[in-house]
Amino acid sequence: MKVEIVELVVLLFSVTCVDAWLQGADCTRVADHKEHAPVTEAVCYLRCLSDALNKLYSEGEKKLLVTEEVYANASLILDDMEGRAGESSTYLSVIRGVMEEQTDRLEKLISYGNKMGNLVAKAGGLFAALEDSLKEVRKEIPGALIKTNKYYTSVAEIVRTVWEDVGEILWKETEAKCGSQKVEGVGEIQTECGAHTCPFADNGVAASAVDKYKGHCLYVGRNSYLRHCFNLPRGRLYRHGPVNTLGDALEWEENWSDYMNFELTVKVQKIFGPLIASFDVGIAPSTLAEMINNITSLQSRFNEVHSNFTSILFTTKLKTEVYNTDSTI
């Protein structure tokens, strides 16, 4: 009998604990509830998300622009190299018959022609990789940029409204009453944002940073201390803004009980996972810089070889034959 009573007590205790464990139990929690972090840190946690989205947008935009620029420059270089290499091949086929007694010069011309062909092939290999990267970037990044901008706007709006609620609006009266308060100004955020509030700061905007969030989500809860006059307009704002934009990546609940008036869960993985994957396509800007440098270096070597080729080609005895090809060399 005693055993049954003990089991019943344990069961009731467990049910009570589960019932008391509010929304977001499996997420990183920021709430003025029990032992969890103070809600003033919500500004830091949420601003971390908006800053990360802003950084993701900037890096994605840079990747798109750099890829386009590098591809355009590489295309011009390769077209020039291929054009001159093709002309050189034409000259060789025309003048072979008149150089039977100039074996040494003919062999040098053939050697230079082969070198130019090899350099063009190497540049072409790099260009092919750039072309593949450009296709991926053009397919993924423009849409991801639009989505990132929408997400950033929504999260930044949430940051602004939460900032108001942690007391950064300066009121003329000690206790503001809805409809009668007079705003004197906006204060500075007093909360110092510790490193723990922003996994993206140390890990970059990457999947490893998303993994730092418990359950890959962030829960923000605010006690009834919240100013009710902010809740109604905020509810309309959220429903037509962030909730509509973020979809199932955001859970916003207005609980008018005595326990919690503000509950917000941001599913970090659903926001950042697809975006990080989209911006990860293609070749990184740092690698693109190396590739265009290599292509430019190949062009310089090509120019040297081509100069040697033309210096032999334009000897007195070969000028007529070269001119007969109607070449622009």
Swiss-Prot record:
Source organism of this protein record: Trypanosoma brucei brucei
Residues annotated as signal peptide: 1-23
Residue positions with a glycan: N73, N294, N308
Keywords, alphabetical: Glycoprotein, Signal
The protein's name in its UniProt record: VSG expression site-associated protein 221A
A Pfam family of this chain: ESAG1
Function: Not known but may be related to activation of the variant surface glycoprotein genes.
Transmembrane segments: none
